Curated annotation (Swiss-Prot):
CC annotations in GO: membrane
Stated name of the protein: Serine protease/ABC transporter B family protein tagD
UniProt: ATP binding residues: G1611, P1612, S1613, G1614, S1615, G1616, K1617, S1618
Location, primary (coarse class): membrane
PANTHER family: ATP-BINDING CASSETTE SUB-FAMILY B, SERINE PROTEASE_ABC TRANSPORTER B FAMILY PROTEIN TAGC-RELATED
Annotated compartments: Membrane
Glycan attachment positions: N629, N704, N781, N849, N896, N1018, N1295, N1424, N1580, N1715, N1755
Presence of keyword Nucleotide-binding: yes
Membrane topology classification: Multi-pass membrane protein
């Protein structure tokens, strides 16, 4: 409990420290921190100039304009001069230092109760932040990061601080709190911060015309509770005004508000909506969530001959056929949103497919989707939408019909239609309040060109105002760059009368021009609805003159207009004739070169040029809707057809034609017609919306006709507001004339135009498949160069050369309340070789020649369309043109753009080279998420953009040559550390899978995880612990593994089976949770260390450009925090792993000790205690250290290796590949090293054990050594063993040192090469010095981690050496011997039964292929000849023994029982390949099982030589090198002998120094005894010791010990007396064929040994005493003995008197009994047996070595004990057995006599001969005869 508390305290303390330092970091970073800008960005242009007839380079720098730079903040409602208006208050540095940290701590410690106060104190508001210079990517990202970081510290919820919009000049509208604004004011790149006044949010008129209309509120942020909270508050305020407000959330950024009178109110007060609205919107403007408020505007709707004008040239018209207009939009989908679409009209109907309503069907011939909410596909009568769609793409299914001549322009295109809800009062459209809901489904349907012929006009008048709707449209186009929208300019005639949606920057705004004169004289008269004009006049007469006209009809007007002239205006025939007369008499006023009088004109409110283009819009004849009538109004398709056709005028009619033309243009590009005029697969291009807009504008033709401004005069269309060369506010850039460049190669009918068109660099050296539009950031520029040559003879020119360049970009949406709406400003300039002037776009011509003192021009800073039109002066010589596009101010970048150039009447082409710069000039270049730089080369071209630095949380990725975010700290921890943990878990799963495969079970992940966590495995026989838990219960698990209470389970396997990873995992499984936590902590620490070199390199990189040490504070704090993180988590990891190590060694040693204690006595006969203790004390800790060390080393090594590898590859993949060239060599060296390490480690452990064994034997037998004065001999032998250990250790050291030296040499050499090559790359500017330093540090990490990982394999090999010895003991522990081992499943028994030896046959072929599987049982095998081939019949007794032995081997004892598995005990081993562990099959040499070193070449090589090493003192055959000893090898050749020695050496390397038996499982069902009568019976019992299975001890014993009687066993030494006693106690197990022993009629093999021994006590002839008190030794057998029991037992054993004479009496400590005499030890042992009070007492020579008095006393005690007990005693003295109820006489393992003393004496047999000489002396020993 205390440990858990300490852990929690440490973890909590660590977390508090981390958060405090994070707080300090963010506070101090943002306090008085002069953040630097990585590169001083300067805009530099290079120009062609002429000086003394030489071409020199002259730089024009925009820095010259800085002194006159406009720093005003331009809002619609206010212009803020930041030079005059004061900044917000700035706390001085001292106050910042003193106040920030306490404020942070107080916030950190605030409780939830303080939340309301906190929200009030740190409530967010809108601020305007102005930057000192133009905003670039770096300063913008720094600003964003500042807001994020300070938000984390301040924990501001629910709104995040963020940038709302850009406001000119150089300012951001920002949502943040006051404390953030104070911190921000210290930034070097900030010049002014001010609060955003609520009045600047409101853009409303409160007049009767607009009052009550919906108002839209733009939101910076919103929550689900915002609307309800606002509405409740406002309605409570409006109660006194008798009005209410209804708020509706349109989306997360937009809210609709309607204020209305509360008719349900009982109040008698009047309702004033003006006052209510002022109050409501003033309150909303003061809320931090709102940022813009404007009134909703009323929406209004704004071709047989039109295509002839659109596809004509500036001078001629074309025919409306497939020759002059070959492309009609095939494969394209255009979209339209309007009042409805009459699906029954023949222009749209499909006989095979219905119109898909709210779904998409690309198989419909014309309408792929119809999206609407009215569940119809119809329009109102004479509907606007049907007419518009017909103009764009309508066409009958049968093209042969006459009506098809009135088809739309893009007849092959399909339509995606959005049905706008209509106002019932006037049929005007009502679009969705969220424009993305309109455009997104059309975009999803496949449309990429869209037309809108409707819009709204500001209620405030003709302002050309940029509304929120315009911002929404710009936003959609900005986020969908491959989409383009065309919008009608409006039909309001006046200047600045544009519809508000048409003021959007990114749309193509379409004005109206007149159509061909033919249209006026034919179609206009036929299909115009003059009835509507007449009724309008009649209505005016009704209202203005006389009520009687209210009932007039147009027919009456025609009848009476001759007498009443005023009625002519309502007569349809008169009106038609008047129009016909006017049209025919004034063709110059009615043709395609004139502007329609009604077309709305520019500019916008901020002076932007609109419209962009004009298209035919007057008397356009197209489809006519018949409303809900579903009859096809086309009839038979004949003409004229006034039911199906209608002629209308307006920009609404011009917009669909321009939309169709744009669609055809897109088809031209998508199908690959550009630039050859025919389809080329590699030329297929997916154009952006800006490119389509640029092409449309670039190829527009400025009209030079007239336009009527009023009813009394006309004006030249290019003379008014002619601000730009080639553009004005009336017609924009001119009228569409597509034929000038939309060339389609045909059969030579149409000649190739004289216009050459260039798109970016497409076609110069790039194909469409790999071409991409450029993007720019502030301070960057790009150049395009072209050449002009005069037209060659015969070329199709015939005109004046002319060039037109157009730049278009899709600008981010503007803040609607800004005075100027352009956000990103690009500028286009031109130079050429025939002029020294610099030409600026949209400036009216040349205005600057570079002369000192000349007034500098001001480039266009309000339009996102810029153009230059130039006519060469010298048309006879070649001219080079260079167009420069500069990123003047890109606050939200980078900004993509489209550049289009065309040249007329000459030969134009790309220049071979384009001089972009001066040699060695440098400029910043755009790098995503970073800053790059590029250098000008000798070819006057900018070089590759190299990463100079990356933004925070980004790093340079050399593979992609970008700044990649995945290298941020969070991603490092997640990807690398998390990936490593995943890998470790995967390996564990694989190990468990291997375990299940080895067991033959089906793998289950559920069982695996339950096994790992110790929660799911069932245990039979033990209930406290699962396989992986830490419980102390014992039991058999479902997978057959044994858990004995230590938590460590070992699966039963053959003892010599190799140790596999699942076996090793079984040792770790109880601690897997702790190890996992330790590993995870270690991985976090490693991940923190991985990132440190990156920041170190960053510091080094920033040093040259840093002004003060404070600028590096950020990086230093991060490094400190990372180091702290590494320290905390590495400490936790070390702490946990250290505890786990000790727990593991404790449990593992406990496990091994349990396995040793559970062994049968034969095991201890074959193995030295010193060797076993060596395993327990040395191998077990070594195994533990290796296991836990390997897991942690692998985890940390992989994490560090992979993490560092990611960095070095991203920094420089070239250098990384150089490093990896050495990996195979390092792997080979490690493999060779591991091979020798494995051999030498196993030999080292073996000889260490031998040395320990010899030392212990010498000290235990010190009496013998001293008695025979052999101290020097023992010293020499021990020294020899130590020398063996030293020599092997020396080889191991040499092996490891040599391998390490090779690795070190290679790695260091490689490091030098990498450093050299890295320095070269840094000099070549391929990457920076900081990156080189980081790379070098990471190389060190990689080297360190790779060395660790390679070393892990060596550790694993050493681990296997220790594991082999440990598992040899664990696997050989008998199953269910004691309560230490629990029951095994029957299927495991059956599995082991199948593995038993099957060599019990006489087949010679089987024995010849025998590989040490059976060395003892096949006596008839030819492989088992005696060494000399002599007979064994040397004596009758030997013959009898051999006979019995052969009988065993050939009789039933060698018969495999089919019903039960053989019990492999110390008797006969049926799977006894372990009885002679070191025996190598030799036809003539049956070696001693204890001989481990026969003919072993121990020099560590394979040459068969013997270096006199490795000979064991227990080896009795070490002289086989004697040339006279040819026994067994005389028939081998030299080659065979070497092969044999190599085989013997391999066997030697497998030596463990431990000899174990392969003990199979005892049947799982035990009989539990609760009481015992004490009756014992032997039936045909035969036995031999496992250490000498070829020597029998007992033969066919049949005897019975009855309860309550005393029995004696006498006979010569070695006759089997003591063995009988040990068999009763089951210290040894009988072979199933070796007879049975019964207790109370129950086979003792079926009684649990511990249960059996609870009724039996055995006193050995050699007493064993423990290092404990005398009292503890006597009471050892009882769990809680009383002092009375102990004293009574001592008295009965005649030990009480001498114990009482000792100083401490019963509390005297016995150190191995060394302070007692032999007799005293014997009496204490007897007392221990007496104290045990067992039913059966087995006494083995307990009176030996006692004086007569003591012996007599003990004999008397035994007589007392026999009452109710069964006593069996072995004795060599008459007195001990004289009074026994029955005596058994044994000789050579057989019972030769039995009876009472008198009966045996009367027989005069063996007993008599033994007793005859001691008849007079009861205490004389029996004689052995």
């Amino acid at each position: 409990m205390k440990s858990n508390t300490n852990i929690r305290v440490l973890l909590v303390s660590g977390l508090i420290l981390i958060f405090i330092f994070l707080g300090i970091k963010f506070e101090f970073i943002n306090k008085n921190n002069n953040d630097k800008i990585g590169i001083n960005r300067k805009l530099e242009f290079s120009y062609f100039t002429k000086n003394n007839n030489n071409n020199n380079n002259n730089n024009f720098k925009q820095d010259q304009l800085k002194n006159k730079k406009d720093k005003r903040i331009l809002l619609k409602n206010e212009i803020i001069d930041t030079n005059i208006k004061k900044n917000i208050k700035k706390n001085n540095q001292k106050n910042n230092n003193e106040e920030i940290f306490p404020n942070f701590i107080s916030r950190l410690l605030k409780s939830n109760d303080d939340m309301e106060i906190q929200q009030f104190t740190y409530r967010k508001s809108h601020y305007i932040v102005q930057f000192k210079d133009h905003i670039n990517d770096e300063t913008r990202e720094q600003f964003k990061q500042f807001l994020i970081n300070t938000d984390i510290v301040l924990d501001e919820q629910p709104y995040q601080s963020h940038i709302v919009n850009y406001i000119p000049h150089d300012s951001f509208l920002v949502l943040m709190n006051d404390e953030q604004s104070n911190l921000l004011s210290s930034k070097e790149w900030v010049s002014w911060i001010g609060e955003f006044e609520p009045s600047n949010k409101i853009h409303l008129n409160y007049n009767e015309k607009s009052i009550g209309l919906p108002v839209y509120i733009k939101l910076s942020d919103s929550t689900n509770s915002l609307i309800q909270r606002w509405e409740n508050t406002l309605n409570s305020i409006l109660t006194s005004y008798n009005s209410k407000v209804k708020l509706t959330l349109i989306n997360q950024k937009k809210l609709k508000s309607i204020v209305y009178c509360n008719d349900e109110s009982s109040s008698q007060s009047s309702c004033s909506l003006v006052s209510s609205e002022k109050l409501v919107y003033q309150w909303i403007s003061e809320q931090s969530e709102s940022n813009y408020i404007e009134r909703s505007e009323k929406f209004q709707t704004a071709n047989r001959l039109s295509p002839k004008a659109i596809f004509g040239t500036k001078d001629t018209l074309v025919n409306n056929d497939r020759i002059d207009i070959p492309l009609r939009g095939k494969g394209q989908i255009l979209s339209i949103a309007d009042t409805g679409l009459d699906g029954s009209h023949c222009f749209f109907s499909d006989s095979n497919n219905p119109i898909p309503y709210n779904s998409v069907n690309l198989n419909h011939r014309k309408v792929v989707t119809y999206i609407g909410s009215l569940h119809d596909n119809e329009d109102y009568v004479d509907g606007h939408g049907t007419h518009v769609c017909g103009s764009a793409a309508g066409a009958p299914e049968d093209s042969s019909l006459a009506i098809s001549s009135f088809s739309g322009l893009a007849t092959d295109a399909k339509i995606a239609f959005f049905d706008l809800a209509s106002d019932p009062s006037n049929n005007e459209p009502v679009p969705p309040e969220d424009y993305s809901q309109l455009y997104q489904p059309l975009y999803n349907a496949g449309a990429r060109v869209h037309g809108d012929s409707w819009g709204s006009l500001s209620i405030q008048g003709y302002l050309g105002s940029y509304s929120d709707d315009a911002g929404s449209i710009d936003d959609f186009l900005y986020t969908h760059p491959d989409f383009i929208i065309l919008r009608a300019a409006g039909n309001n005639e006046q200047y600045s009368s544009l519809l508000s949606q048409a003021t959007a920057k990114n749309v193509i705004t379409v004005g109206a021009e007149q159509t061909t004169h033919e249209s006026y004289t034919t179609d206009a008269l036929e299909y115009s609805n003059f009835e509507t004009v007449a009724k309008s006049t009649l209505n005016s007469l009704c209202q203005s003159f006389d009520d009687k006209y209210c009932t007039y009809t147009t027919a009456q007007c025609c009848t009476e207009y001759s007498t009443v002239k005023g009625l002519s205006g309502c007569c349809t025939s008169y009106i038609k004739n008047s129009y016909a007369s006017i049209f025919s008499s004034q063709p110059e006023l009615y043709n395609e070169n004139n502007i329609c009088s009604f077309s709305s004109k520019g500019p916008t409110h901020d002076g932007r040029l609109k419209p962009d283009i004009v298209a035919p819009g007057q008397y356009i004849t197209s489809a006519r809707s018949n409303g809900a009538n579903t009859t096809d109004q086309c009839g038979d398709g004949s003409l004229p057809n006034t039911n199906a056709l209608l002629s209308e005028s307006g920009t609404s009619m011009a917009t669909p034609l321009a939309t169709a033309a744009t669609t055809i243009l897109r088809q031209y590009l998508v199908d690959g017609y550009y630039p050859t005029g025919s389809i080329v697969e590699s030329n297929k291009l997916q154009p952006t919306g800006s490119l389509l807009k640029a092409l449309m504008i670039n190829n527009a033709q400025l009209l030079n006709g007239t336009f009527p401004l009023s009813s009394t005069n006309t004006n030249p269309s290019n003379a008014v507001f002619d601000t730009f060369a080639g553009a004005n506010f009336v017609q924009g850039w001119g009228s569409l004339r597509m034929s000038e460049w939309l060339y389609v190669e045909s059969s030579g009918v149409k000649p190739k135009p004289s216009r050459w068109v260039g798109i970016g660099e497409l076609g110069k050296d790039k194909k469409a498949s790999n071409w991409k539009e450029y993007s720019l950031s502030t301070g960057q520029n790009v150049s395009y160069c072209f050449t002009y040559k005069p037209s060659s003879s015969g070329s199709n020119s015939g005109g004046i050369p002319r060039i037109v360049a157009t730049l278009v970009w899709t600008d981010p949406p503007s803040y609607s309340g800004a005075k100027l709406n352009l956000v990103n400003n690009l500028d286009l300039t031109m130079t050429n070789t025939e002029s020294e002037f610099i030409f600026y776009s949209n400036s009216g011509g040349s205005s600057y020649n570079g002369t000192k003192g000349t007034t500098l021009p001001l480039q266009d800073s309000i339009n996102n369309v810029e153009g230059i039109i130039y006519t060469p002066i010298n048309t006879k010589s070649e001219i080079s043109f260079r167009f420069i596009i500069a990123g003047t101010n890109i606050p939200i970048g980078p900004q993509n753009f489209s550049f289009v150039f065309h040249g007329e009447n000459g030969e134009f082409d790309w220049a071979d080279s384009c001089m972009q710069c001066n040699p060695d000039d440098t400029q910043p270049c755009f790098i995503e998420n970073g800053v790059g730089s590029q250098t000008c080369g000798d070819d006057y071209l900018w070089g590759r953009c190299l990463v100079q630095s990356c933004n925070n949380n980004y790093n340079y990725n050399s593979i992609s040559d970008k700044c990649s975010k995945f290298l941020s700290y969070n991603y490092i921890v997640i990807i690398v550390a998390g990936g490593t943990m995943s890998l470790i878990i995967t390996v564990l799963i694989l190990i468990k899978y291997m375990e299940y495969k080895e067991n033959g079970n089906k793998f289950s992940l559920k069982e695996f995880f339950s096994g790992v966590l110790g929660t799911g495995k069932n245990v039979s026989g033990g209930g406290k612990g699962g396989s992986g838990g830490s419980g102390s219960g014992s039991g058999t698990l479902k997978d057959g593994t044994i858990d004995d209470g230590t938590g460590i389970h070992v699966r039963p396997k053959p003892k010599d089976a190799p140790v596999t990873p699942p076996d090793l995992y079984s040792l770790l499984s109880p601690f897997i949770i702790e190890i996992t936590i330790s590993t995870a902590c270690s991985l976090v620490a490693t991940a923190a260390s991985i990132l440190q070199p990156y920041y170190i390199g960053q510091i080094i990189q920033d040093i040259p450009t840093t002004k003060g040490i404070g600028d590096l504070r950020d990086q230093f704090i991060i490094i400190f925090l990372l180091a702290l993180l590494e320290f905390v988590f590495s400490t936790i990891s070390s702490w946990i792993s250290g505890i786990v190590n000790e727990k593991m060694v404790m449990r593992l040693q406990n496990k091994v000790f349990r396995a040793l204690i559970a062994q049968d006595m034969g095991f201890f006969q074959k193995n030295s205690a010193a060797v076993l203790m060596n395993v327990l004390i040395v191998d077990t800790p070594m195994l533990r250290s290796s296991l836990t060390g390997i897991l942690l080393s692998v985890s940390v090594g992989i994490c560090k290796f992979v993490g560092s590898l990611v960095f070095i590859f991203t920094i420089s993949w070239k250098l990384s590949l150089a490093f990896f060239a050495t990996v195979p060599v390092l792997a080979i060296v490690t493999q060779v090293q591991s091979k020798f390490t494995k051999r030498l480690t196993r030999r080292l452990l073996f000889h260490n054990s031998k040395a320990s064994q010899h030392g212990q034997e010498s000290m235990v037998n010190m009496h013998v050594v001293s008695n025979y004065c052999k101290q020097d001999r023992e010293i020499a032998k021990y020294s020899e063993q130590l020398m063996m250990v030293f020599q092997i250790s020396r080889r191991l050291i040499i092996n490891n040192t040599f391998a390490a030296s090779i690795k070190w040499l290679m790695v260091e050499s490689l490091a030098f090469i990498i450093l050299y090559f890295g320095a070269y790359l840094a000099i070549q500017k391929q990457f920076t010095v900081g990156l080189l330093v980081s790379f070098s540090l990471y190389i060190g990490y990689v080297i360190d981690s790779s060395t660790t990982l390679f070393g892990v394999y060596s550790s694993y090999v050493q681990c296997l050496a220790s594991a082999t010895r440990v598992f040899l003991i664990l696997r050989s522990a008998p199953r269910k011997r004691t309560t230490l081992e629990e029951e095994e499943l029957d299927n495991i028994i059956d599995t082991n039964q199948d593995n038993n030896n099957n060599n019990n046959n006489d087949d010679i072929s089987d024995s010849s292929s025998d590989d040490d599987d059976d060395n003892n049982n096949n006596k008839n095998s030819k492989n088992n000849k005696t060494k000399s081939g002599e007979s064994d019949d040397s004596s009758s007794e030997d013959a009898e023994y051999k006979k019995n032995k052969n009988k065993r081997n050939n009789g039933k004892m060698t018969t495999k029982l089919s019903n039960s598995p053989p019990l492999v005990g110390e008797g006969i081993d049926n799977n006894n390949n372990n009885n002679n562990d070191n025996n190598i099959n030799d036809d003539n040499n049956q070696q001693d099982p204890n001989n481990n070193n026969n003919e072993i070449d121990d020099d560590g090589d394979d040459d068969g030589d013997d270096d006199d090493e490795g000979e064991d003192e227990n080896n009795n055959n070490n002289n086989n090198d004697d040339p006279n000893d040819n026994n067994g090898i005389e028939m081998l050749t030299e080659k065979q002998l070497r092969k044999r020695k190599r085989q013997m050496k391999k066997e030697f390397y497998k030596k463990t120094g431990i000899s174990c038996l392969e003990l199979n499982l005892i049947p799982s069902a035990y009989t539990e005894l609760t009481e015992c009568r004490g009756e014992i019976e032997f039936k045909n019992v035969s036995f031999c010791y496992p250490s000498r299975a070829d020597v029998g001890v007992l033969y066919n014993i049949d005897l019975k010990f009855e309860s309550g009687k005393c029995y004696g066993l006498v006979g010569p030494s070695g006759s089997g007396k003591s063995t009988l006693l040990e068999l009763i106690s089951r210290f040894y197990s009988l072979h199933p064929s070796g007879g049975k022993i019964y207790m109370d009629g129950i086979d003792i093999a079926k009684i649990r040994p511990s249960n059996l021994r609870s009724f039996v006590t055995n006193v050995h002839q050699h007493p064993f005493l423990f290092d404990a008190t005398i009292s503890e030794n006597i009471g050892y057998a009882l769990d809680n003995p009383t002092q009375e029991d102990i004293i009574e037992a001592a008295k009965l054993a005649n030990a009480h008197e001498f114990i009482q004479s000792l100083p401490k009496q019963y509390d005297t400590m016995l150190t191995d009994g060394g302070n007692l005499s032999g007799g005293q030890k014997k009496r204490i042992a007897v007392a221990r047996a007496i104290c045990a009070k067992r039913k059966i007492m087995l006494l083995d020579e307990i009176t030996a070595e006692l004086d007569p008095e003591s012996e007599e006393a003990i004999n008397k005690s035994i007589k007392v004990l026999t009452r109710g007990h069964t006593v069996v005693m072995v004795a060599h003295k008459v007195a001990a057995v004289r009074d026994c109820d029955k005596i058994f006489v044994l000789d050579k393992g057989q019972i030769v006599e039995q009876g009472t003393h008198n009966q045996l004496m009367a027989k005069k047999g063996k007993y008599y001969r033994m007793f005859a000489f001691s008849e007079d002396d009861d205490y004389a020993p029996l004689l052995v005869l």
